[in-house]
Amino acid sequence: MNIVSDVNYATSVAALRMLQASSVLDITEEDFDFLTGDKIWIATDRNRARRCVEACVYGTLDFVGYPRFPAPVEFIAAVIAYYVHPVNIQTACLVMEGAEFSENIINGVERPVNAAELFAYTLRIKAGFKETVIDAEENARQKLRANGLK
């Protein structure tokens, strides 16, 4: 695992925390059931699927009437991992492809991800990156020890 992967994962963890803390989704109960349900999305569901995922990504902005701005891959993948039923994760990645990693947005580099990359990244989030969490905890402990704390 490299530094970029660790930073991307940490960004996704922050996104998951934001999702858990937010109760603002600009989505109907019927659409929420569609998004989280185990019914497989078919081709004719594509627009609804995108609208539902976007409602979770941009819910707060939409609710208060602010304009949307491009969300990074880390946030979109976190939304997909958190809300979309596993049978529809690949489809959600397909309809949401084209986003950029936060680092690229910050650096002004245009490199949109395709569906396969978004899917792979979403799987990493679903898996929890156990080794990343363990490494992060160990790094935090080392910093505390270096500062004289146990």
From Swiss-Prot:
InterPro entries: Scaffold_D, Scaffold_D_sf. GO terms for biological process: viral procapsid maturation. Keywords: Host cytoplasm, Viral capsid assembly, Viral release from host cell. One of its GO terms (cellular component) is host cell cytoplasm. It is found in: Host cytoplasm. This is External scaffolding protein D. Component of the procapsid particle composed of 60 copies of the internally located B, 240 copies of the external scaffolding protein D, 60 copies of each of the viral structural proteins F and G, and 12 copies of protein H. Assembles the procapsid by joining twelve 12S pre-assembly complex into a T=1 icosahedral particle, called 108S procapsid. Ten proteins D bind each 12S complex, which are formed by three pentamers of F, G, B protein and a H protein. The scaffolding protein is released from the provirion after genome packaging to form the mature virion. Pfam families: gpD (PF02925). Its main location: host cell. Belongs to the microvirus D protein family. Phi KhT, a host-range mutant of phi K, can grow on E.coli C and B, besides K12, and is more thermosensitive than the parental phage phi K.
